[in-house]
């Protein structure tokens, strides 16, 4: 799975670029801050439980935006809550990523037409990198979204903009269920 799993045979030297080292360190140690606002937060909590165990992916939840590099917005964002979402986003250090989880944070959900108090997508107030659809999305979907964030980090380069990395990411597809099964098989062995 990792760089050293295959073993280093002769000279014990690994040659790589600065981009690869920085991206490997960032994607192997994501620190998300969950911003749970509705029923999607329950699925986010289930993802952190022992059945799915996000820590095996190097993902350690944080409660402070100053320690986080990923914000997971899960649930219905109201107009009053939008100001707090922006404030928390601004408190996060660079590079920072946002994952929008669920129909409500993606586009307003079932409240989009008649809910005057509901923001019609969190992307209207902060930039979103990855969208996870569903009402509420299953933990496997959230893990798939987190893997998309890791792929986005892997594709970033010093001279490449975030928009270009997002275009590259849109061309790739990841099956989260196969990755979960792969990790379970490794854990059993």
Swiss-Prot record:
Keyword list, A-Z: 4Fe-4S, Cell inner membrane, Cell membrane, Iron, Iron-sulfur, Membrane, Metal-binding, NAD, Quinone, Translocase, Transport
Give EC number(s), comma-separated. 7.1.1.-
Which compartments is it annotated to reside in? Cell inner membrane
| Disulfide feature | none
Q: Write out the catalysed reaction.
A: a quinone + NADH + 5 H(+)(in) = a quinol + NAD(+) + 4 H(+)(out)
Q: Which domain of life is it from?
A: Bacteria
**What InterPro entries does the annotation carry?**
NADH_UbQ_OxRdtase-like_20kDa, NADH_UQ_OxRdtase_20Kd_su
Q: Which GO terms describe its biological process?
A: aerobic respiration; electron transport coupled proton transport
Q: Which residues bind [4Fe-4S] cluster?
A: 39-40, 104, 135
Matching Gene3D superfamilies, A to Z?
3.40.50.12280
Cofactor entry: [4Fe-4S] cluster
Q: How does it sit in the membrane?
A: Peripheral membrane protein
> What subunit structure does UniProt give?
NDH-1 is composed of 14 different subunits. Subunits NuoB, C, D, E, F, and G constitute the peripheral sector of the complex.
Q: Which family, according to the similarity comment?
A: Belongs to the complex I 20 kDa subunit family.
Sum up the protein's function in the record's words: NDH-1 shuttles electrons from NADH, via FMN and iron-sulfur (Fe-S) centers, to quinones in the respiratory chain. The immediate electron acceptor for the enzyme in this species is believed to be a menaquinone. Couples the redox reaction to proton translocation (for every two electrons transferred, four hydrogen ions are translocated across the cytoplasmic membrane), and thus conserves the redox energy in a proton gradient.
Q: What is this protein called?
A: NADH-quinone oxidoreductase subunit B
The species this protein was found in: Chlorobium limicola (strain DSM 245 / NBRC 103803 / 6330)
The primary gene name is nuoB
């Amino acid at each position: 799975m990792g760089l050293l799993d295959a073993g280093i045979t002769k000279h014990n030297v690994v040659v790589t670029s600065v981009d690869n080292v920085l991206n490997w360190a960032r994607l192997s140690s994501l620190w998300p801050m969950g911003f749970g606002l509705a029923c999607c937060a329950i699925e986010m909590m289930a993802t952190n439980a022992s059945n799915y165990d996000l820590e095996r992916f190097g993902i350690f939840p944080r409660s402070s935006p100053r320690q986080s590099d990923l914000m997971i917005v899960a649930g219905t964002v109201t107009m009053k809550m939008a100001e707090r979402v922006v404030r928390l986003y601004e408190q996060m250090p660079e590079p920072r990523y946002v994952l929008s989880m669920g129909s409500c944070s993606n586009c307003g959900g079932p409240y989009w037409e008649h809910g005057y108090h509901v923001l019609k997508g969190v992307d209207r107030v902060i930039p979103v990198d990855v969208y996870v659809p569903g009402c509420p999305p299953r933990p496997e979907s959230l893990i798939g979204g987190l893997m998309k964030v890791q792929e986005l980090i892997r594709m970033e380069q010093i001279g490449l903009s975030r928009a270009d990395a997002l275009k590259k990411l849109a061309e790739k597809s990841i099956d989260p269920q196969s990755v979960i099964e792969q990790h379970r098989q490794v854990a059993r062995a």
